[in-house]
Amino acid sequence: MSESDPNHEIVVARLMRQLHGFAQGLGLDRETTRGIVDRVIADMPLAPDDDRLARARNWMLIASA
């Protein structure tokens, strides 16, 4: 799924909404979280959201260290 794909923004919004509290708890800003979400979607275009969320949370933990 490319960033020019209209579904990309829908998926980004959905994942960002679900990761908002986790990101805040780690002290990550919106731009950092968005970059992680974009990367997860690019790396896992056909994966279900649960798998994407797990990967994003792992990367967010690393980014906050």
Each PLM stretch: what is its role?
Residues 1-21, 45, 49-50:
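A short, charge-rich alpha-helical start-of-domain segment used by transcription regulators
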Residues 19, 23, 56, 60-65:
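Hydrophobic-face residues of short alpha-helical interaction/recognition segments
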Residues 30-47:
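Conserved RNAP core-binding helix
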Residues 35, 47-62:
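Short, aromatic/basic-enriched loop-to-helix "N-cap" motif that marks the start
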